[in-house]
């Protein structure tokens, strides 16, 4: 035994050693990388040479041997006035000998990572890198002292080997980038880089947040970039130690230690731990609670093993005896005549009682009797009908019906015959409806369908409407075709032609579109502008918010962040903390604990820096600790308000105090002390030293020159001026020309700090450190430049679906309806006001109550008297008037025999792929079958056990409104739900999410008059998003998109309220799309231009036809001879206009024509006298010409028969008359004597 105990001891010590090593692991590292050191003269800080005080150069430098330089680093707490002595409280380090008087090292990069890795393993690290580990929360402020030393193997005291000492007090945050520091000391110039990095598995600005991924007994999680724990699949809880059990497992009676299990508690059993274990030895009983034995019918006793119906279970009496149950497990037999015995087994006159049934003959035998049975019967008393169906005589699946001395086969439709052995000709009944022909098959038939039809009997019209109609057109399915009914403004076979430029709804966010000839115009609502109303106007200038609320611009709207005491759109309505007195049990500083823990639990509403004091009316007040203020004591009082730091010092606000970070050249609590740079003697006793700000000046003795009086020849050397300054030797002194950004006698003072302009936002304080900066953020902000608001709502502090409002260093819980309290932990008891009347019982529910009415009363408050009405029947069940029930996802109510149900399409029923056929939940309705879900429908595994009941045809009506499509119109809205995958329950599918949305009361309320369709699918924008397409059916008479918009927003409002649904609690963002983006109209350019050109071409044709007809009429008129006028004014023009008398006319000689032309030229028409009449027929006076002119003035409206005649009136000299056209008119107005034919005219011309 002793040997065994000593054997265990080394292992225990080894375990303790491992734990100690683990406990001493650092939280982070301070890293310093030396880049360069320049000691031009090879001197020590005392002025002596490194290896003796002999000077060999003419300039006075040390030339016999160079220094063996190495560096020591001391890291300690922040000191306003740096003291080089004292312990290095944060750590220290040193380098090996790096070089001589001056040397350069490679720049810092991955060297720190490599050195840190080698330092852990004990390997060699980069010589110029110093790594100081720390095992405490990094305070961000520090003091760094860097010393350069000369290595000497002799016994020279250390202080005499110091080359240079520089110091830096500042702030630095953990990050990967390096910060550069430059120091110009009395003797040497140093360049180095520093940074702080957290060790692996440590996070935050102080490296004290530990998170190491693990998958063991203590947790199952990974770590994100901020050190937060992210549970692995199948695990939950703060430490991710709680396993997610099998879906359906009764957690009251079981649990699990491995994800997906369901391990039952003591006394429970079954797949889901929902079956109790009965009392041991229970024979004929069951249990409701563990270790009970509830007997079945006819059984009794402690173990239910006593037969209370022995006669019914054993039938002991024979020969027709009647069995009587006497006691448990006891019986008596009442024997018929002729039988005796306990069981009536002995016969005296066996056949006396006619024991043989069904015509059997009885014969007495020594043991009793025997029955000779007729055909078809069997048994001791011929009471058993011989089962002729036992041999399965019916073929082809026929059903056998046993009969007396025979059987009958009930055959399937495809078979006939006595035993269903003949194939029936199913085509005789003409089952095919829309087919070319019917073909009889063995056990069935086949229909050769016409084009456009399908199905077993060709009874299904193939839907040709899938995705045919564009721009929201309604597709009408035809036989082997389709027809698109286009909305207003569109046309074409597929509604692809846009007539109305507003039909595509180009105006966004509620803008009203006006169609113009060359485009459209959007009339934007208040707060919007732009061509498509896409530009937000600043609705917060001036601010509409009252009572000090802050205004935020939203998309087309604004939001007022109201204080606690006010609400409403503009924060103008005072809030009532306890409306209606319903929350009288609520304490302003906490909540009332349950019966098991009496008292009031604190809510933490005042945060870690305040004490809550309850006030009347459920209000509270926060008494803040010193240094804090605000409603929730969340604001740290700014102690830097009065700018206490002097000389450009940076003030850092702390709790009830402040700290000054001084620039180079100043120190002290308020940066009001200029350290003496003349200590120790930088002039090496060769001159007088004068102290400056962050510098010094040496007035050298005769014979010495230089900044430190180190040379006898030159005032300038390569390092007299710092930071790239140029040195000019002026004989007795020197002058430095500093580069941009630096000033001072030797260019040691920076003009522009790295904090100008201030890169830190949200009240952060910038602390410059060389060429970089660090931001000290106010409480509630974090990040390199204080841009990230710390999430005060993580972990979730609000219970029961309350929404956490994250502020700056505070949070507030906005409770779901029915809950109240600082953290929404209290369920408001709506039954406190006794709302139920007439003796009804009030049952408190979440955000409401339910009244259990006495007989004869109904209604929400039992205020209605029940009147005899007709019940409603649904699925074989009767429901009384006024009652409500659920049918799938719809709610129904009975109104005097009429079922009033919501119209929501409930989708496909889930089914268990691995379920037994006897399980009702795993079976599909008739005509449907359980199929696996489509790939990608699982939102949170495992989902492989569940499928969907799918029919041959899709259940929802055909609609173009589908998820993952760009279709939006007056009857289509699209919702995009984003989920926090860590909060989604295991086994959740897209179908389960869709079913949950369909079951919302807001969804059922919207589906009152039309069928509401909600179709879901995974969104293409992300793995944790689901798209929901919302539409109505039918949608033919929808005037606008108001119905679909109100429905979509009602569903979104119900989702954001969340309630107690664990699935809706995981929703982090909801996006609503109800307006189609304005599309390009270039596709309509060609049809529009064609239409314009067609109109222009038609107009040209009409004008050409009109012009041609006009010219034709003018030519016809020019061919007609004109009548003589009263004064012969047309005579001179007659040879020109009369075609009959033109040169070369028919029948006219050349000479005759000249004479006529000569006479016409010398003819002067006399003036017409009043009342002179032309020669005409008797009885015609001056009125004849007027009548003729009147006839001429009628134009072409007279009878066309007048065109058949040519009327001429001649003067005395007919050769000079000018023909005028005359119109034919009936009556005496026509002078037939003046009418001549063309032949007469030609004859007259020859004469």
UniProtKB/Swiss-Prot annotation:
Annotated glycan sites: 153, 570, 619, 752, 1060
Record organism: Mus musculus
What keywords are annotated for this sequence in UniProt? Calcium, Developmental protein, Disulfide bond, EGF-like domain, Glycoprotein, Membrane, Notch signaling pathway, Phosphoprotein, Repeat, Signal, Transmembrane, Transmembrane helix
Q: Where is the EGF-like domain?
A: 241-274, 275-305, 307-345, 347-383, 385-421, 423-459, 461-496, 498-534, 536-572, 574-634, 636-672, 674-710, 712-748, 751-787, 789-825, 827-863
An annotated GO cellular component:
plasma membrane
SUPFAM superfamilies per UniProt: EGF/Laminin, Growth factor receptor domain
Name the record gives this protein: Protein jagged-2
- SS bonds (residue pairs): 198-207, 211-223, 231-240, 245-256, 249-262, 264-273, 276-287, 282-293, 295-304, 311-323, 317-333, 335-344, 351-362, 356-371, 373-382, 389-400, 394-409, 411-420, 427-438, 432-447, 449-458, 465-475, 469-484, 486-495, 502-513, 507-522, 524-533, 540-551, 545-560, 562-571, 589-612, 606-622, 624-633, 640-651, 645-660, 662-671, 678-689, 683-698, 700-709, 716-727, 721-736, 738-747, 755-766, 760-775, 777-786, 793-804, 798-813, 815-824, 831-842, 836-851, 853-862
Composition bias, Basic and acidic residues: 1115-1125, 1192-1212, 1230-1247
According to the UniProt entry, its GO molecular function terms are: calcium ion binding; growth factor activity; Notch binding
Q: Name one GO biological process term.
A: sensory perception of sound
Chain residue ranges for the region called Disordered = 1115-1148, 1167-1247
Instruction: From the UniProt record, report the name of the gene that encodes this protein.
Output: Jag2
Question: Which segments does the topology annotation call Cytoplasmic?
Answer: 1104-1247
Q: Where is the DSL domain?
A: 196-240
Question: What does the UniProt record say this protein does?
Answer: Putative Notch ligand involved in the mediation of Notch signaling. Plays an essential role during limb, craniofacial and thymic development. May be involved in myogenesis and in the development of peripheral and central nervous systems.
Keyword Nucleotidyltransferase part of the UniProt annotation: no
Its chief place of residence is membrane
Phosphoserine: which positions carry it?
A: 1125
- The transmembrane segments are 1083-1103
In which tissues is this gene expressed?
Found to be highest in fetal thymus, epidermis, foregut dorsal root ganglia and inner ear. In 2-weeK-old mice, abundant in heart, lung, thymus, skeletal muscle, brain and testis. Expression overlaps partially with Notch1 expression.
Where is this protein localized, as stated in its record?
A: Membrane
Report membrane topology. Answer: Single-pass type I membrane protein
Superkingdom to which the source organism belongs = Eukaryota
Signal sequence annotation: 1-23
Gene3D superfamilies given in the database record: 2.10.25.140, 2.60.40.3510, Laminin
């Amino acid at each position: 035994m002793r040997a065994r105990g000593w054997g265990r001891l080394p292992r225990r010590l080894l375990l303790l050693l491992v734990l100690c090593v683990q406990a001493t692991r650092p939280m982070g590292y301070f890293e310093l990388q030396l880049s360069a050191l320049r000691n031009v003269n090879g001197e020590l800080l005392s002025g002596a040479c490194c290896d003796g005080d002999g000077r060999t150069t003419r300039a006075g430098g040390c030339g016999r041997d160079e220094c063996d330089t190495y560096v020591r680093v001391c890291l300690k707490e922040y000191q306003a006035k740096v003291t080089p002595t004292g312990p290095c409280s944060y750590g220290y380090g040193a380098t090996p000998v790096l070089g001589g008087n001056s040397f350069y090292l490679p720049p810092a990069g991955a060297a720190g990572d490599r050195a840190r890795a080698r330092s852990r393993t004990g390997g060699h690290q980069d010589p110029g890198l110093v790594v100081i580990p720390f095992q405490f929360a990094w305070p961000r402020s520090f003091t760094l002292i860097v010393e350069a030393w000369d290595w000497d193997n002799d016994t020279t005291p250390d202080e005499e080997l110091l080359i240079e000492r520089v110091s830096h007090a500042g702030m630095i945050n953990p990050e990967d980038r390096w910060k550069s520091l430059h120091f110009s000391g009395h003797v040497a110039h140093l360049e180095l880089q520093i940074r702080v990095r957290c060790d692996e598995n440590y996070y935050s600005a102080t490296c004290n947040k530990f998170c190491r991924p693990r998958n063991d007994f203590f947790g199952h999680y990974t770590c994100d970039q901020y050190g937060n724990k992210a549970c692995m699949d199948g695990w939950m809880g703060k430490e991710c130690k709680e396993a997610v059990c099998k879906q359906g497992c009764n957690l009251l009676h079981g649990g699990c230690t491995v994800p997906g299990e369901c391990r039952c508690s003591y006394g429970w059993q079954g797949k889901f731990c929902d079956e109790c274990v009965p009392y041991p030895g229970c024979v004929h009983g069951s249990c409701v609670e563990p270790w009970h034995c509830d007997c079945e019918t006819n059984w009794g006793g402690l173990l239910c093993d006593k037969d209370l119906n022995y006669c019914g279970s054993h039938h002991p009496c024979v020969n027709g005896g009647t069995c009587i149950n006497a006691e448990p497990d006891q019986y008596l037999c009442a024997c018929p005549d002729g039988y005796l015995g306990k069981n009536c087994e002995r016969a005296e006159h066996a056949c006396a009682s006619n024991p043989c049934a069904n015509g059997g003959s009885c014969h007495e035998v020594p043991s009793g009797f025997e029955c000779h049975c007729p055909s078809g019967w069997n048994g001791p008393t011929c009471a058993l009908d011989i089962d002729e169906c036992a041999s399965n005589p019916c073929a082809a699946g026929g059903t056998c019906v046993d009969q007396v001395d025979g059987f009958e086969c009930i055959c399937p439709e495809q078979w006939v015959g006595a035993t269903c052995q003949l194939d029936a000709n199913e085509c005789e009944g003409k089952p095919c409806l829309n087919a070319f022909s019917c073909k009889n098959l063995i056990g069935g038939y086949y229909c050769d369908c016409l084009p456009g039809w399908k199905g077993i009997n060709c009874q299904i019209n193939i839907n040709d409407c899938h995705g045919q109609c564009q721009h929201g057109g309604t597709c009408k399915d035809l036989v082997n075709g389709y027809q698109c009914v286009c909305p207003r403004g569109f046309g074409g076979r597929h509604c692809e032609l846009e007539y109305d430029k507003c039909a595509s709804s180009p105006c966004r966010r509620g803008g009203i579109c006006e169609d113009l000839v060359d485009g459209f115009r959007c009339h934007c609502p208040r707060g919007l502008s732009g061509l498509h109303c896409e530009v937000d106007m600043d609705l917060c200038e001036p601010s509409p918010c009252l009572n000090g609320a802050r205004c935020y611009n939203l998309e087309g709207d604004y939001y007022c962040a109201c204080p606690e005491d006010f609400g409403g759109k503009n924060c103008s309505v005072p809030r009532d903390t306890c409306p209606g007195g319903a929350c009288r049990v609520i304490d302003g500083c906490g909540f009332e604990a349950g019966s098991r823990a009496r008292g009031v639990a604190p809510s933490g509403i005042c945060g870690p820096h305040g004490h809550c004091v309850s006030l009347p009316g459920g209000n509270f007040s926060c008494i803040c600790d010193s240094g804090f203020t605000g409603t929730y004591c969340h604001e740290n009082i700014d102690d830097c308000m009065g700018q206490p730091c002097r000389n450009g010092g940076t003030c850092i606000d702390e709790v009830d105090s402040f700290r000054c970070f001084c620039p180079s050249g100043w120190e002290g609590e308020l940066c009001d002390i200029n350290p003496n740079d003349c200590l120790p003697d930088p002039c090496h006793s060769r001159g007088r030293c004068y102290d400056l700000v962050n510098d010094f000046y040496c007035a050298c003795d005769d014979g010495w020159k230089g900044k430190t009086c180190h040379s006898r020849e030159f005032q300038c050397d390569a390092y007299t001026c710092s930071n790239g300054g140029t040195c000019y030797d002026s004989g007795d002194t020197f002058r430095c020309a500093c580069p941009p950004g630096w000033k001072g006698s030797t260019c040691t003072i920076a003009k522009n700090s790295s904090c100008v302009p201030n890169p830190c936002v949200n009240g952060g304080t910038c602390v410059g450190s060389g060429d970089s900066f660090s931001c000290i953020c106010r409480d509630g902000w974090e990040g390199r430049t204080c841009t990230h608001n710390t999430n005060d709502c993580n972990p979730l502090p609000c219970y029961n679906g309350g929404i956490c409002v994250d502020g700056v260093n505070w949070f507030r819980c906005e409770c779901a309806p029915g809950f109240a309290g600082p953290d929404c932990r209290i369920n408001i008891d709506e039954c406190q006001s006794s709302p139920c009347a007439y003796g009804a019982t009030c049952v408190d529910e979440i955000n409401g109550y339910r009244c259990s009415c006495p007989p004869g009363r109904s209604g929400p408050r039992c205020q209605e008297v029940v009147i005899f009405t007709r019940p409603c029947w649904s699925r074989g069940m009767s429901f009384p008037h006024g009652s409500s029930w659920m049918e799938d996802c719809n709610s129904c109510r009975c109104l005097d025999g009429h079922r009033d149900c919501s119209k929501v399409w409930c989708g496909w029923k889930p089914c268990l792929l691995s379920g037994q056929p006897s399980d009702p939940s795993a079976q599909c309705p008739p005509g449907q079958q359980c199929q696996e879900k489509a790939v990608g429908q699982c939102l949170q595994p495992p989902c492989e056990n569940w499928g969907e009941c799918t029919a041959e045809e899709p259940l929802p009506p055909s609609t173009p409104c589908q998820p993952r499509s760009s279709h939006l119109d007056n009857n289509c809205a699209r919702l995009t739900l984003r989920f926090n995958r860590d909060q989604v329950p295991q086994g959740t599918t897209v179908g389960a999410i869709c079913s949950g949305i369909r079951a919302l009361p807001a969804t059922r309320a919207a589906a009152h008059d039309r069928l509401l369709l909600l179709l879901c699918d995974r969104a293409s924008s992300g793995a944790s998003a689901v798209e929901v397409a919302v539409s109505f059916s039918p949608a033919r008479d929808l005037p606008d998109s108001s119905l679909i918009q109100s429905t979509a927003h009602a569903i979104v409002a119900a989702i954001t309220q969340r309630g107690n649904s664990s699935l809706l609690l995981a929703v982090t963002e909801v996006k609503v799309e109800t307006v189609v983006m304005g599309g390009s109209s270039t596709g309509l350019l060609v049809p529009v231009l064609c239409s314009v050109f067609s109109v222009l071409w038609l107009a040209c044709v009409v004008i050409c036809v009109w012009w041609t007809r006009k010219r034709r009429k003018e030519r016809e008129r020019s061919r007609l001879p004109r009548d003589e006028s009263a004064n012969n004014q047309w005579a001179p023009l007659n040879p020109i206009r009369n075609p009959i008398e033109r040169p070369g006319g028919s029948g006219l000689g050349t000479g005759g024509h000249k004479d006529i032309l000569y006479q016409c030229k010398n003819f002067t028409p006399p003036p017409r006298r009043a009342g002179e009449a032309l020669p005409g027929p008797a009885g015609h006076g001056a009125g004849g010409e007027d009548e003729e002119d009147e006839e001429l003035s009628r134009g072409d409206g007279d009878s066309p028969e007048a065109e058949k005649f040519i009327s001429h009136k001649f003067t005395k000299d007919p050769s000079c008359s000018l023909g005028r056209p005359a119109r034919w008119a009936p009556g005496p107005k026509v002078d037939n004597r003046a009418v001549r034919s063309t032949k007469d005219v030609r004859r007259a011309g020859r004469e």
